[in-house]
Amino acid sequence: MDLEQLAQATADTFNDRSYRDKAKDMMDPDVLIVDKPTNQEMRGPDAYVQYSDGFVKAIPDLRGTVIENKQSGNKVSSRVRGQGHFTGTMVTPQGSVPGNGNPVEIEYEIEQEFNDAGKVVRFVIDYDMQDFMRQLGAA
């Protein structure tokens, strides 16, 4: 697989929820996960699963559609449109926010850096936190 296909596989495994089983195969054991809006950093495939689970628990039908990929060296930046309904619970540092059924549609950017073995060594996600929280009805 080329790097854009590997980047697409990350989105595909999120969408079909197989990321829980495949994260260790797709990611380096020391992968760095960065949520830019919150400055949260985590390490390892298990942290990626926990991070992804947070969004799935809040928006169980959340799916991401890759709009565009740009490759530069061993990095792929993907522009993604996420859509779903806030029917679960979003856990934040300020406490839990219960779902209200609101539709959510947000564009976000994911930058993935790959090693020579095709494993993700760095996964950075960036999105408009204010818009996201507004759509949830939490802002």
Regions found by a protein language model. Name each.
Residues 1-139:
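C-terminal and inter-domain tail/linker signature
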